[in-house]
Amino acid sequence: MDLLAPLSAVVLTYREVSAEALGKVGQEMKRCIERRARAFPMYVLHTCSRVEAYLYGAPPEEVQEVAEAYRRYVDSVRVITGAEAARHLFRVAAGLDSILIGETDVLGQVEEAFDRQVRAGYTRGLLKTVVERAVRVGKRVRTETAISRGPRGLGSLSIIYVSRLLDLRQAKAAVLGAGAVGSGLAMELASRGVGKLYILNRTFEKAREVAAKTGGEARPLTREEVERCLRECDVVFSSVHSMEYVIDRVPEGASVKIVVDLGVPQTVAPGLPVKVVRIEDLRQVAEQYNAERAAEVAKAEAIVEEELAALPRLLARRYVEETVAALLETAMTAAEEEGARAGCDAAALAAKTTVKRVLLPLVEKMKKMAEDGQMEEAVRLANVLTQAVGRKT
């Protein structure tokens, strides 16, 4: 039984379309996961350079419907299935599919999306295991190779870009957003000795937390405070998730000279009377560092393949564990019902004891089989036992 076969991914990246188009698709996928994830597990990764929807156990027609939702905005959509879908997610988490090879920001974004969607109940079951393993791959790659040495991500590249246009040590800077990208921006600006730093976030406590680490000043992310920063600062970096423009005008007499848009989707309106730096402007800077990191790519790819080879065994073990938990729950409920019918607590206790005595050795045997690589046999036995007690897997 191939437990990777039910995995599908619908993928769109910066290579195929503009950041503006990615933003529109990202909005559609937010609505899509809210509608569909109750029926089957889903995981959506939306960053400034990609929108990817992962589904587990969805019928082919459902996967195609998700792909069609992408095609309302763009034609260049890829559908990947099985082990290839897992490999793609592992490479994304490792930074191997990024504008800047080995960037660390994307790993934080993978984790943020995962945590949020697990809490919402969207990412669960074996899909949860796949994404957890992708995070592990990303951490291993950055620990065991030098692929992330230097700029950490698009935020770092944007700071390098801006530093060629003005002296950051004499500048006032604001960072809108305190997530993975925003907090990274703030930390790097502080390390470069920026003249004055402001951190704005919708959750003010998060802004205060980042400000405390960077010596910056926390402000709430409101329209009034954004305009205040535009009036006071030389450069403003936007890294927020927003379905509307966060910056759509520049106040008269504002000090701002440069606005950097790393938002998801684009959060800075076109046509502003200042220099706006967008992701497309950072590709040339990225190419320089990608050449330096090329020697580490093979090492990172080897880690991806090693973890991918181990994934089927891990999924089999998790599948057995989940099936066994459901099996025991069903059996214990049946024992309680029998005891209740007998009208005797002692009878219920005896029934539960019998269930444990009969099933636990089989449970341990199935787990051991999965751990020893007898994956198909373990899964088959789990299914047989589950069907025997009347629960379909």
Swiss-Prot record:
Q: Does the keyword NADP apply?
A: yes
Q: Which SUPFAM superfamilies match?
A: Glutamyl tRNA-reductase catalytic, N-terminal domain, Glutamyl tRNA-reductase dimerization domain, NAD(P)-binding Rossmann-fold domains
GO BP, one annotated term: protoporphyrinogen IX biosynthetic process from glutamate
Q: Which UniProt keywords apply?
A: NADP, Oxidoreductase, Porphyrin biosynthesis
Residue(s) at site: Important for activity: H88
Q: In which pathway does it act?
A: Porphyrin-containing compound metabolism; protoporphyrin-IX biosynthesis; 5-aminolevulinate from L-glutamyl-tRNA(Glu): step 1/2
Matching entries from InterPro entries are given as: 4pyrrol_synth_GluRdtase, 4pyrrol_synth_GluRdtase_N, GluRdtase_CS, GluRdtase_dimer_dom_sf, GluRdtase_N_sf, NAD(P)-bd_dom_sf, Shikm_DH/Glu-tRNA_Rdtase
Subunit info?
Homodimer.
- HAMAP family per record: Glu_tRNA_reductase
Q: What does this protein do?
A: Catalyzes the NADPH-dependent reduction of glutamyl-tRNA(Glu) to glutamate 1-semialdehyde (GSA).
| Domain remark text | Possesses an unusual extended V-shaped dimeric structure with each monomer consisting of three distinct domains arranged along a curved 'spinal' alpha-helix. The N-terminal catalytic domain specifically recognizes the glutamate moiety of the substrate. The second domain is the NADPH-binding domain, and the third C-terminal domain is responsible for dimerization.
Tell me the protein's name: Glutamyl-tRNA reductase
The lineage, from the top, is:
Archaea, Thermoproteota, Thermoprotei, Thermoproteales, Thermoproteaceae
